[in-house]
């Protein structure tokens, strides 16, 4: 036999080792003894050490890489990793199936049913059959790059089997820690003095986020694939079960417990069987996932917010424990909501120490009759959020009295009130309440809002308590001097230490001024008296002398970075800005819908509440909340202050033409929610007058003569008798006319510059997000699609564009860089 040269031998060893991995981890059919596997692995490792050029990224030797020097970089998921809605009862599952059958017209649709592993969701990206990147789910849109750690998992193939895989393949699945392996690891950890893992799920998540892949490699992690993300169009699927079969063929482990079942009966029977064997499984599961098998049906059902309508997680009953309520305190949120929180004697529930639970509202406390000193049953709903489910009244201590909502806010002393019919009590102090200001600022700077990196909760609390920041606009006036003063005082554990540290930055009369400030707030500089409890806050509130900061004696980089981050946030998108304002009921999805529909902050802040119902999926309650927010002079002043301090919306655009159908008189009458005015009656009334103010002039007799039924006619005339309603109608009509004037006229709609064009975006844009770019392009008539084909009009390519750019070149698709995109958008804005 002719000896193989090193390159041939290395290739042969890689092939045999990868084949062995596939049979061992996927098929559970070992082909070679462990000793033979180890021998081949050592031989390949030696070859690659001798000939470094022979090492390849997919080599079995690369499963343990080099230590990562810094924290993980962010990865933006091409296809979002959606969360699932939960079902906690049989009726919820029946309702889930009913919605699908009603929409699709099938009596017993097929579902893929599988255990919901209690691990960490990840996305694996393969290009030309080679594993190139792995990321955590993160927030569903952006995750962390954990490629090096995922290479250490023997159950994740580095190179795909077969040759039927697509050019680009994203595989979605769960990294988990088998329970026997978890227990064995903890046994060894105790013997060696290592930190033991709290539970398998935390063990999996923590292991995957180690900065050193060698540590990850020591942890007993496994992987199951359950779906796909981005896939190039050279492979087509019709059913989810086909996807799972292909994943198995390509080398991915897929749960052997996955079954194809039919109708609600099939789902519930599967759930019962899995519930019975749950404790015998070698891994933790917290429920069952049901997915509609037919992919065309999935497309028809669509999505709601961040979850698909064609899938649901049927959760098992959570684990429960008993503990004692030590106190009931009130927490004030950013909207003033006063939420009672029970402080508990610490207890372990499903592997997590629970010390407090939210009691939601006063009605919930009254329903459960929770009292201080009670023994309560605590469970983790969905194995995530702790909650009190019952009180053991037989164990109630003598003298325990029923709890009632305090009349005053524990933070600012303002009255706590509840609107008629509402479940939530609120502090009436609004932004005069420091707790609400703190929460409002925390929300404003959060990553998915204005994204001010480096401004943490503790810093926000100090800025508000020290009266440096009174509202979000004050952030844009923060100076280096203010931040360094904050750090100097908070780092000083005693007044004496503050004076000692201050000598590096101030001398003479100014140092004496600082001493006088300390005396003024009650500090005895002799060191004999007691130090006031809040002396640091009182000192920060005082009028300080000027400091000459010695940058060698105090860290300044953090403050400079924070000021730079605040400055960067001045350029933002409309959806981020609206979300950052913290309006009640306005989450990211609603903010995005508002931005897409109206396009301009100047428009949105002037609209009366009924016009917000023109936006898809916004109902009366949400519309009223937005309108109420915008009607408050203090909120309008806050927006003015932000604009005055340089905050600019970078993606403003005209209102979308789809609003036109919502701006008819009949639609306006519907949006006003006048009693007895049904959609059919609104259409009839719209024929009687061209505008709302003119319709208001019609008396009861005129309406009756026009054929309007008595109940509707009387309701309308009574509604218009209110001066407030007349004012609302006039304002509504005026804003409607303004919006209509800014829309493209019907005869010009087809002349939108990108009408009928198909556009793909790839890579990272520096000036605006891809979502903002997509919104701008859609407003100009473009259709945004996810993959490049011969029908693509042009591709917008930012930094790190990936395979879409290669495909665009191959298909001779026109390619725009960011400069060309911005020039085009600016040209249209100018027109």
From Swiss-Prot:
SMART domains: BRCT, LIGANc. InterPro entries: BRCT_dom (IPR001357), BRCT_dom_sf (IPR036420), DisA/LigA_HHH (IPR041663), DNA_ligase (IPR001679), DNA_ligase_AS (IPR018239), DNAligase_adenylation (IPR013839), DNAligase_N (IPR013840), NA-bd_OB-fold (IPR012340). It comes from Xylella fastidiosa (strain Temecula1 / ATCC 700964). Belongs to the NAD-dependent DNA ligase family. LigA subfamily. Zn(2+) binds at residues 409, 412, 427, 433. CDD domains: BRCT_DNA_ligase_like, LIGANc. NAD(+) binds at residues 34-38, 83-84, 114, 137, 174, 291, 315. DNA ligase that catalyzes the formation of phosphodiester linkages between 5'-phosphoryl and 3'-hydroxyl groups in double-stranded DNA using NAD as a coenzyme and as the energy source for the reaction. It is essential for DNA replication and repair of damaged DNA. One of its GO terms (cellular component) is cytosol. One of its GO terms (molecular function) is metal ion binding. It catalyses: NAD(+) + (deoxyribonucleotide)n-3'-hydroxyl + 5'-phospho-(deoxyribonucleotide)m = (deoxyribonucleotide)n+m + AMP + beta-nicotinamide D-nucleotide. This is DNA ligase. Pfam families: BRCT (PF00533), DNA_ligase_aden (PF01653), DNA_ligase_OB (PF03120), DNA_ligase_ZBD (PF03119), HHH_2 (PF12826), Nlig-Ia (PF22745). Its cofactor is Mg(2+); Mn(2+). Its EC number is 6.5.1.2. One of its GO terms (biological process) is DNA repair. Keywords: DNA damage, DNA repair, DNA replication, Ligase, Magnesium, Manganese, Metal-binding, NAD, Zinc. Residues 749-831 form the BRCT domain. The keyword Ion transport does not apply. The active site is at 116 (n6-amp-lysine intermediate). It is an enzyme of class 6 (ligase).
């Amino acid at each position: 036999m002719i000896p193989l040269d090193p390159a041939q031998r290395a290739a042969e060893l890689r092939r045999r080792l990868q084949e062995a991995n596939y049979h061992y981890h996927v098929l559970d059919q070992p082909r070679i003894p462990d000793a033979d596997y180890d021998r081949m692995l050592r031989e390949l490792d030696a070859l690659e050490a001798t000939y470094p050029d022979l090492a390849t990224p997919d080599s079995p030797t690369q499963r343990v890489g080099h230590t990562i020097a810094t924290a993980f970089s962010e990865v933006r998921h091409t296809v979002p990793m959606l969360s699932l809605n939960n079902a906690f009862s049989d009726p919820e599952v029946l309702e889930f199936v009913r919605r699908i059958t009603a929409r699709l017209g099938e009596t017993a649709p097929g579902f893929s049913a599988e255990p919901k592993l209690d691990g960490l969701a990840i996305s694996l990206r393969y290009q030309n059959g080679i594993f190139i990147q792995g990321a955590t789910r993160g927030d569903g849109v952006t995750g962390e790059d954990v490629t090096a750690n995922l290479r250490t998992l023997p159950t994740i193939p580095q190179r795909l089997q077969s040759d039927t895989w697509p050019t680009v393949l994203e595989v979605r699945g769960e990294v988990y820690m088998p329970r026997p392996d978890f227990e064995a690891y903890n046994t060894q950890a105790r013997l060696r003095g290592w930190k033991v893992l709290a539970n398998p799920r935390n063990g999996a998540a923590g292991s995957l986020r180690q900065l050193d892949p060698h540590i990850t490699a020591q942890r007993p992690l496994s992987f199951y694939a359950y779906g796909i993300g981005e896939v190039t169009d050279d492979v087509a699927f019709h059913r989810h079960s086909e996807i799972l079969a292909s994943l198995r063929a390509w080398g991915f482990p897929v749960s052997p417990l996955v079954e194809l079942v039919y109708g609600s009966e099939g789902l519930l029977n599967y759930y019962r069987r899995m519930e019975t064997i749950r404790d015998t499984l070698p891994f933790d599961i917290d429920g069952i996932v049901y997915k509609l098998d037919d992919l065309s049906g999935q497309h028809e059902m669509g999505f709601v917010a961040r979850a698909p309508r064609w899938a649901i997680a049927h959760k098992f009953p959570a684990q429960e424990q008993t503990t004692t309520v030590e106190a009931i305190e009130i927490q004030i949120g950013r909207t003033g909501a006063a939420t009672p929180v029970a402080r508990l004697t610490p207890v372990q529930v499903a592997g997590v120490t629970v010390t407090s639970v939210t009691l939601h509202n006063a009605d919930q406390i009254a329903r459960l009759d929770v009292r201080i000193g009670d023994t309560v049953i605590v469970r983790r709903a969905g194995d995530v959020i702790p909650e009190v489910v019952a009180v053991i009244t037989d164990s109630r201590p003598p003298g325990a009295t029923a709890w009632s909502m305090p009349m005053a806010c524990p933070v600012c002393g303002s009255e706590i009130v509840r609107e008629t019919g509402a479940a939530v009590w609120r502090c009436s102090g609004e932004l005069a309440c420091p707790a609400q200001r703190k929460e409002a600022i925390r929300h404003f700077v959060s990553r998915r809002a204005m994204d001010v990196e480096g401004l943490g909760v503790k810093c926000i609390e100090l800025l508000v308590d020290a009266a440096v920041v009174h509202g979000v606009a004050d952030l844009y006036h923060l100076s280096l001097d203010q931040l360094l003063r904050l750090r100097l005082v908070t780092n000083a554990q005693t007044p004496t230490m503050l004076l000692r540290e201050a000598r590096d930055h101030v001398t003479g009369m100014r140092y004496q001024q600082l001493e006088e400030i300390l005396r003024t707030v009650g500090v005895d500089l002799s060191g004999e008296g007691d130090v006031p409890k809040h002396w640091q806050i009182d000192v920060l509130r005082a009028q300080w002398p000027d400091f000459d900061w010695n940058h060698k004696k105090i860290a300044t980089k953090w403050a400079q970075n924070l000021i730079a981050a605040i400055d960067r946030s001045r350029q933002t998108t409309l959806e981020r800005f609206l979300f950052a304002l913290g309006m009640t009921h306005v989450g990211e999805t609603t903010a995005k819908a508002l931005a897409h529909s109206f396009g301009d902050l100047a428009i949105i802040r002037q609209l009366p509440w009924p016009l917000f119902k023109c936006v898809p999926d916004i109902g009366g309650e949400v519309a009223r909340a937005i309108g109420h927010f915008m009607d408050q002079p203090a909120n309008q002043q806050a927006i003015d202050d932000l604009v005055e301090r340089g905050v600019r919306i970078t993606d403003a655009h005209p209102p979308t033409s789809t609003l036109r159908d919502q701006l008819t008189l009949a639609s306006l009458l519907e949006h006003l929610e006048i009693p007895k005015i049904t959609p059919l009656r609104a259409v009839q009334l719209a024929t009687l007058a061209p505008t709302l103010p003119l319709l208001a002039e019609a008396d009861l007799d005129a309406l009756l003569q026009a054929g309007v039924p008595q109940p509707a006619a009387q309701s309308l005339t009574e509604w218009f008798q209110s001066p407030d309603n007349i004012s609302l109608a006039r304002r509504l009509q005026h804003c409607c006319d303004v919006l209509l004037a800014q829309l493209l006229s019907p005869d010009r709609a087809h002349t939108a510059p990108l009408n009928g064009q198909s556009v793909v975006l790839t890579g990272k844009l520096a000036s605006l997000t891809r979502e903002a770019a997509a919104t701008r392009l859609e407003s100009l008539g473009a259709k945004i699609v996810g993959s490049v084909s011969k029908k693509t009009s042009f591709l917008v390519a930012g930094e790190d564009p990936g395979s879409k750019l290669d495909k665009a070149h191959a298909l001779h698709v026109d390619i725009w860089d960011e400069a060309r995109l911005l020039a085009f958008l600016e040209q249209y804005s100018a027109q």
